């Protein structure tokens, strides 16, 4: 695979999108055109991924157009910090890719303040009875989800920034609970665990965005591959690396049966065939993270599998037409919902994976 050649194609398309999108915040490209999530819900969980793409591009090209566009979205997010009741467990996705990325790359003190504000909101969702960060809002006080493993790096950053161990302690406890209750013995994972919010007793494991209870939603699996690996990066806790490896072995075994592109759910009926390329792209990044962490003699499995996934995505599922929004095609939001569409987070992880191979990535997590 020629990662440099793929990146050059990405650079051309992302530059065209940056000029075309202006101040819009993209999510799903329908008929080749991104809608603007500012008009739908500014606090929507995916709204940080386009700025994440922009900061990655700015870091590796130096083009100030990317920086300017990313800064605008970050400033827009001040509105959701002011009305924080609408925020949720995905503040990591929102602010790691905006304010924290800005601060890390430019030293902007206002960005630091925004990131710390978001980290305190995330920490405030922790339930000590069950040792988990509460997912969503409304009546879901006892819910935790695997996605949150990708948000807790915001807490690790805040803890280091403030030299305050409380943030890491919350992140560790949540991750410990995920190892215990979200990961299954075979390395697959539950999307959701529901606890009694007063006692912490586990109650049920609903289907979530997969096919059914007990099935295997591939993007949730990808969150676990990368999320546990990031837990190891930030803490050095071997248990997290072992959990990441178990999740990775399960993911690799499944995509090896389908040309190294992930089905939407690994335990769904054979028909209809539903893909989720965003899961594959995210998992590839997680596999590359694991490859950096393991001994040299273990590295090949994770590195090679990641490269085969990224190569398969480029060969089978990419649109390079600069007049159409979205690079990675055939992403799926959930089983039976918005299937086979370009998703902004799919493009983010695809870009991150390619940049990782080239040694040009900016560690946003």
Regions found by a protein language model. Name each.
Residues 1-365:
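Glycan-recognition and catalytic cores of secretory/periplasmic carbohydrate-active enzymes
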